[in-house]
Amino acid sequence: MGSWIPKLLLLQLVLLLTKHADSSSIIKYLPGFEGPLPFELETGYIGVGDEDEDQMFYYFIKSESNPEEDPLLVWLSGGPGCSSFTGLVYENGPLGFKVEAYNGSIPTLVSTTYSWTKVANIIYLDQPVGAGFSYSRNPFADRPSDTGSAKLVNEFVRKWLAKHPDYFSNPFYVTGNSYSGKVIPAIVQEISNGNYICCKPQINLQGYVIGNPVAYYDHDKDSRIPFAHGVALISDELFESLKRSCGGSYSIVDPLNTECLKLIKDYHKCVSGIYQELILKPKCETTSPDCYTYRYLLSIYWANNEIVRRALKVVEGSKGKWERCDLSVRSNQDIKSSIPYHMNNSIKGYRSLVISGDHDMTIPFLGTQAWIRSLNYSITEKWRPWMILDQVAGYTKTYANKMTLATVKGGGHTLEYKPEENSILFKRWISGQPL
């Protein structure tokens, strides 16, 4: 008799969560922010997958300029498993945390200066299922895959637009960074195929924006050693020995190649004290308020507060501890390379902007340049600096297939390290201006 109790409780939980499918709420106040929000925020869930069992949580922020005509973006954070709230409060959203020692109260939110929502409507989407506040009503669901996530994001966007039909005609872009940069080209392909095969009205798909994106992860990682040499983190002698012994392949090494393995250990000793997401910043303990990464803890304190969850209209019981980047969200990484998707999307005429912070050692700009070269696109504008107030902000190159590469001088793995430069870069590109 007692063995039925856990099953009964599980059934009750599933029935409880089922009642909350496909909901949305307008949020005028957020805990931690003083006064009413100075922008329009909506949160909610859209059910996708078999019988809508996967409930995708989103934050939608209207453009502060002209929401009826400004572009509509869906933003996906990396990981896989990072909540899109990361993008909202740390990268390109209208809110950020006041960085101060946590005292047990709700962390303070403040307005930001360089939000992309000044010129665009943005849906910050928690994906894959399990990231952020997204959840599955099926406790036995298979772990998500890259291609599966691409299909579900396509389904999410179509269902979201069906509930927000005023945005069907807005120019639509898929945006994100890091690991999501590998999946985004596949999402663009899914949406494009849906437009041609099945679905009316069509989504006004125009292109995509990816920041320090994973393309072919092993090759991306291989570029770390040449990058480290280029910025004087390893010696000429070690670099030449690595090239000679490893043949340029540093992430997948023959276990019998003991000389290469030994040299890679020497390399790791040299860079172990480096903060790889932005090598200019110190590597330090996250628990110290003086450490840059301390700000990430504030989002964890904030999102795990019950008052906050009620304000966001998070379904009660749908999520245990919220993690900014939940490493337990393990995905089947079945897209080994995004390059075929880039090529297919360019043939269809979609625009793309590839942003690369030039001091990121996680996905170095050298690897990004290498996979772009492999596309064999003809160059329409040669490598040149792009400027802000007569100062070099980075370098750019434009290709015939509507792809633009832009580095950000002094930038890191994500947009947050150079918010002004990334905001100006995005505004110029999205409006069709020269960088």
Swiss-Prot record:
GO molecular function, one term: serine-type carboxypeptidase activity
Cleavable signal peptide: 1-23
Pfam families documented for this protein: Peptidase_S10
Compartments, record wording: Secreted
GO process annotations (BP): proteolysis
Family classification: Belongs to the peptidase S10 family.
Family annotation (PANTHER family): SERINE CARBOXYPEPTIDASE-LIKE 14-RELATED, SERINE PROTEASE FAMILY S10 SERINE CARBOXYPEPTIDASE
Name of the featured protein: Serine carboxypeptidase-like 14
Species, as recorded: Arabidopsis thaliana
